[in-house]
């Protein structure tokens, strides 16, 4: 039997909210003999409609990834463009960073995508070493739905932490109004919208809050999944964006591209230098202008950059360093490495238009070095 995975997505702009806020994957079994005898065409939603010439060629040119919803708008564009020039089909499941790493651990996907570096516990669950390749940088923005207010609010680290701790409960609280003079903020109750799944976006946001608020660090901490003091959970950036849009008084955290594509307001956040910074590709780039360690695992939250947006983060493609496993072919392994190399080089040209920051030369250099360490049967692929 052949197992086909179908990724069902909305054909509107990537990240645009539809009635179904969750992406779904279906498993369908096909009989090889039935396909041979009937000569049937099996239609699957991928980034290509071109059928390969042979089964082995098809396997080599089909790559499956899963993970970060933070990356989904960018990945949709990248994988479509890559298919045009190579014929390689990339099927990507926007299931959240945690689920993506779980699927990589189980070896049911070729790569995982995560906005959080793997933890020691996650590393120990792998059957072999994995590498993290930075592929983009983005911003986690604070979006809200305040009746009658479309202004870009100013928020300090302390006020933001206390909102999510549940100690600031209405929009006309004196601490919020003092930062936003001239804005008529209503007495509407604040409702927190947060992620319900394991999330790299959550990791970026809670890492930031743990750095700027001792109360948050003590009571909640940081991670891809935390015990939220208050609020409602949504699955994926799509789900949280939907909760915010549908709920008067709501506030939540989502990736910048989702906010812009869905015309959602978002706050300027005060950074270490005391400046209120609007999240943008320029302010993300400024935050990312820091030394990159050899393993690429670095946080971009609350950096010293004078013009940097303080809730920024890298997103990584994660793959096994040794690619000879589960009967994989060398051709498939080579196509995976070539894909990731293209993403950090030619693929960067698509970042700005989708509100992601292109990688710095330093990040690309580290990514290149890591890709050169990937092997098949102990021999370097590149």
Region spans (language model):
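N-terminal secretory signal peptides that target proteins for export/translocation
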Residues: 1-34
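Intrinsically disordered/low-complexity terminal segments and short unstructured peptides
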Residues: 7-8, 15, 24, 43-45, ...
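Bacterial N-terminal signal peptides
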Residues: 38-49
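Flexible loop/hinge segments at secondary-structure junctions
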Residues: 55-382
């Amino acid at each position: 039997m052949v197992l086909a995975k179908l990724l069902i997505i909305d054909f509107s702009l990537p990240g645009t909210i539809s009635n179904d806020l969750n992406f779904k994957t279906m498993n369908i079994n096909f009989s090889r003999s039935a396909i041979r005898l009937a000569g049937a065409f099996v239609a699957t939603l991928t980034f290509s409609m071109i059928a390969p010439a042979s089964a082995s060629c098809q396997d080599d040119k089909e790559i499956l990834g899963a993970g970060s919803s933070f990356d989904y708008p960018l990945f949709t564009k990248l994988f479509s463009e890559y298919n045009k020039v190579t014929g390689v089909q990339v099927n990507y499941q926007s299931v959240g960073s945690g689920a993506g790493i779980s699927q990589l651990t189980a070896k049911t996907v070729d790569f995982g995508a995560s906005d959080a570096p793997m933890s020691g516990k996650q590393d120990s669950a792998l059957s072999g070493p994995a590498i993290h390749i930075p592929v983009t940088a983005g911003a986690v923005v604070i979006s809200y739905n305040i009746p009658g207010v479309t202004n870009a609010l100013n928020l300090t680290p302390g006020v933001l932490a206390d909102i999510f701790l549940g100690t600031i409960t209405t929009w006309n609280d004196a601490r919020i109004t003092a930062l936003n003079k001239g804005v008529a903020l209503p007495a509407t109750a604040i409702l927190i919208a947060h992620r319900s799944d394991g999330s790299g976006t959550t990791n970026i946001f809670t890492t930031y809050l743990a750095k700027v608020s001792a109360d948050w660090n003590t009571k909640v901490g940081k991670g891809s999944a935390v015990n939220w003091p208050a609020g409602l959970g949504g699955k994926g950036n799509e789900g949280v964006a939907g909760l915010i849009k549908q709920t008067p008084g709501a506030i939540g955290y989502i990736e910048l591209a989702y906010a812009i594509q869905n015309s959602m307001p978002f706050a300027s956040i005060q950074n270490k230098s005391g400046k209120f910074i609007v999240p943008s590709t320029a302010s993300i780039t400024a935050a990312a202008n820091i030394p990159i360690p050899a393993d690429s695992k670095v946080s971009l939250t609350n950096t010293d950059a004078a013009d940097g947006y303080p809730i920024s983060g890298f997103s990584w493609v994660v793959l096994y360093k040794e690619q000879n496993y589960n009967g994989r072919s060398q051709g498939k392994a080579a196509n995976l490495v070539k894909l990731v190399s293209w993403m950090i080089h030619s693929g960067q040209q698509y970042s700005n238009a989708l509100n992601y920051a292109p990688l710095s030369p330093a990040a690309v250099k580290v990514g290149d070095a890591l890709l050169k360490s990937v092997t098949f049967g102990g021999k370097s692929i590149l």
